[in-house]
């Protein structure tokens, strides 16, 4: 049931995905019901990636007609039950039911940016529900997480979790994200041509430095954590320093930052967590003109109890060239009115 990577390889070909899902399942679980479950879940993941919708039923047409009604009933039961009701969740059928139950029965929060509540919190809440169902929790959570991540995107994963996330052998979060990007053939080389600036201290917290990407070549004294708001090449990562990537795109387009308010808030929570650990933080983007000032302003607003726009004035006092794009400014007003 850990079939999400299969989906990425066949996003543009539903028929090929159905065939691949069943063949991969057959490698270890030759029971046709195991193949059915993988087909259903793979098609649900594909649909979620392409549309953002959560629907476990759309793949029923690809299930043998003799078992189709049975699977429909099983999904009905999942939606009427709690994950903990599926005691035999090491079996693929009940594992799928437990995962779908956690997703379907966990309410999607109503967005309230100023209160720090977001609809994408559904990913975190539903995964918590899946784990608390008990028994074979890693399987159920892996199944649920594949679909939730497909619907909400990597930017909906809390930074606190991303700091812990890892793969084998020795893969960190950024490595796993890069692997997924390569599977969908979206990886492209990149470089930056900027005029380097001198890092400056945050006006409301001298343990936070604001900088451009060039600062990675020579960190300010004492910096032991880096929060990157732009893409960073592996070769540019400073040695011996924890680095956390944040997906924040400096473009004013509807699909550029689907989870913008959450990402800004979550990044500020990350900085607060790092500071509470006694870390000195470097916050940077490419040129320190739009993304970094925005996050720095949200951080200042939260720590000082002021409006976002007033906090931004403080940021521009140390970064005169700061000018967050219009979407970022609107988000700043929503998050810290």
Which residues does each predicted region cover?
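Cysteine-based protein phosphatase catalytic domain of the PTP/DSP
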Residues: 194-280, 301-334
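Phosphate-handling active-site elements
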Residues: 12-16, 111, 122, 152-165, ...
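Short, small-residue alpha-helix embedded
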Residues: 141-152, 293-304
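Conserved glycine-rich phosphate/nucleotide-binding loop
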Residues: 151-192
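A phosphate-binding catalytic loop at a beta-strand-loop-alpha-helix junction
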Residues: 279-297
């Amino acid at each position: 049931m850990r079939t999400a990577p299969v989906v990425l390889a066949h996003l543009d070909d539903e028929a090929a995905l159905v065939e691949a899902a069943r063949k991969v399942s057959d490698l270890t679980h030759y029971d046709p019901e195991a193949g059915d479950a993988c087909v259903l879940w793979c098609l649900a993941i594909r649909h979620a990636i392409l549309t953002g919708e959560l629907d476990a039923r759309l793949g029923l047409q690809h299930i043998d007609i003799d078992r189709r009604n049975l699977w429909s009933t099983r999904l009905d039961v999942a939606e009427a039950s709690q994950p903990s009701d599926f005691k035999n969740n090491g079996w693929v059928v009940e594992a799928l039911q437990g995962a779908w139950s956690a997703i379907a029965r966990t309410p999607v929060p109503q967005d309230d940016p100023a209160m720090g509540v977001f609809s994408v919190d559904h990913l975190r809440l539903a995964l918590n529900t899946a784990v608390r169902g008990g028994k074979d929790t890693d399987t159920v959570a892996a199944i649920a997480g594949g679909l939730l991540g497909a619907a909400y995107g990597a930017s909906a994963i809390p930074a606190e979790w991303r700091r812990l996330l890892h793969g084998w052998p020795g893969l960190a979060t950024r490595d796993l994200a890069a692997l997924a990007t390569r599977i969908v053939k979206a990886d492209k080389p990149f470089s930056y041509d900027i005029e380097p600036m001198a890092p400056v201290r945050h006006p409301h917290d001298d343990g936070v430095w604001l900088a451009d990407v060039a600062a990675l070549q020579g960190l300010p004294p004492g910096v032991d954590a880096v929060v990157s708001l732009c893409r960073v090449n592996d070769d540019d990562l400073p040695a011996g320093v924890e680095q956390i990537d944040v997906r924040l795109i400096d473009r004013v387009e509807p699909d550029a930052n689907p989870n913008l308010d959450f990402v800004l808030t979550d990044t500020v929570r990350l900085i607060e967590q790092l500071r509470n650990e006694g870390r000195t933080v470097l916050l940077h983007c490419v040129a320190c003109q739009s993304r970094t000032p925005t996050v720095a302003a949200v951080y200042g607003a939260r720590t000082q109890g002021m409006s976002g726009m007033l906090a931004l004035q403080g940021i521009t006092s140390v970064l005169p060239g700061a000018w967050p794009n219009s979407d970022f400014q609107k988000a700043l007003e929503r998050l810290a009115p």
